[in-house]
């Protein structure tokens, strides 16, 4: 049963004070960021500190602690801080993909307000000046943050154009389509494309691009189709190799776990999400990831 903001604030304080990490994880898993963000404000007004600071004092350090601190901080403030980290020094391309591409216009504009408040800079201006412009991944990010999408009502024509861009290896045309097409029309374009040409868009992207360019283009494609597809793909990147990327998985989870509930099903093409969490990460983080992504370590997911 969902609690009121007041009752949830009280319950959160009780759990943090008890230093019960398992209970805190379970509570976190039950509420979306729109509810948790209200509690963050209420908690500060009542107890004089933010829940993230209280969590830092109560729990042992480590990626699980960081994840829970992020979860009980305003979601778009977290995005703003992660963006700033990604742009500090050498660009963290993976972080930029996670932070920028898995984001719709409303969240992006709200993030921008936090970014300006915290860093006294304009997020878009900083991003545009800090990343290069010659590589497809950076061109995609620069176009994506405009959030200027419109319906063209030319699905068949766009599908044909998409094939032309993919066959010729023309990143500019592909990026324009990704950045200017609504989610609804992208789904239709993808359907017509697959039916007409007998091949998946993702297959041609993967065969024409590599490394960061491929990861960025596939993330954008999957996000427009279904956020759960994008989250699953990004999780698969973090979970690749003999050891998982804890920093990336914490970042992905904090930004996406309540916005991509289909992730655990979409991940089946890459493996078993719960099993990978348990295998790749320390026990604390593994348990937290399984709870937040709603996967059963004993089951198929």
From Swiss-Prot:
Keyword Cytoplasm: yes
Family: Belongs to the annexin family. Giardin subunit alpha subfamily.
Function: Giardins are involved in parasite attachment to the intestinal mucosa and in the cytoskeletal disassembly and reassembly that marks the transition from infectious trophozoite to transmissible cyst. They may interact with other cytoskeletal proteins such as microtubules in the microribbons or crossbridges, to maintain the integrity of the ventral disk.
Cystine pairings recorded for this chain: none
PANTHER family found in the cross-reference section: ANNEXIN, ANNEXIN B11
Single Gene Ontology BP annotation: cytoskeleton organization
Database matches in Pfam families: ANXE1_4th (PF22293)
Originating species: Giardia intestinalis
Record's protein name: Giardin subunit alpha-9
Assigned keywords, A-Z: Annexin, Cytoplasm, Cytoskeleton, Microtubule, Repeat
Annexin repeat ranges per the UniProt record: 2-72, 74-146, 153-223, 225-294
Subcellular localization: Cytoplasm, Cytoskeleton
């Amino acid at each position: 049963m969902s609690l009121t903001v007041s009752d949830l604030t009280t319950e959160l304080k009780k759990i943090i004070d008890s230093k019960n990490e398992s209970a805190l994880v379970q509570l976190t898993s039950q509420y979306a960021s729109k509810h948790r963000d209200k509690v963050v404000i209420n908690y500060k007004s009542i107890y004089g500190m933010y829940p993230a600071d209280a969590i830092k004092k109560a729990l042992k350090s480590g990626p699980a602690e960081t994840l829970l601190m992020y979860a009980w901080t305003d979601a778009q403030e977290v995005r703003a801080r992660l963006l700033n980290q990604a742009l500090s020094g050498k660009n963290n391309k993976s972080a930029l993909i996670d932070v920028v591409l898995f984001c719709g216009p409303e969240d992006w504009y709200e993030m921008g307000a936090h970014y300006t408040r915290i860093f006294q800079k304009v997020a878009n201006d900083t991003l545009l000046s800090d990343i290069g412009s010659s590589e497809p991944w950076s061109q995609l990010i620069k176009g994506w943050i405009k959030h200027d999408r419109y319906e063209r009502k030319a699905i068949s024509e766009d599908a044909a154009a998409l094939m032309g861009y993919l066959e010729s290896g023309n990143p500019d045309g592909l990026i324009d389509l990704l950045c200017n097409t609504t989610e609804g029309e992208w789904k239709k374009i993808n359907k017509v494309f697959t039916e007409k040409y007998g091949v998946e868009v993702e297959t041609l992207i993967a065969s024409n691009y590599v490394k960061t360019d491929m990861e960025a283009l596939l993330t954008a494609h999957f996000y427009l189709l279904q956020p759960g597809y994008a989250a699953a793909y990004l999780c698969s990147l973090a979970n690749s190799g003999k050891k998982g990327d804890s920093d990336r998985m914490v970042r992905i989870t904090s930004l996406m776990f309540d916005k991509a509930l289909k992730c655990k099903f979409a991940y089946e093409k890459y493996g078993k999400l719960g099993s990978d969490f348990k295998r790749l990460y320390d026990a604390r983080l593994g348990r937290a990831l399984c709870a937040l992504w709603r996967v059963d370590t004993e089951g198929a997911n």
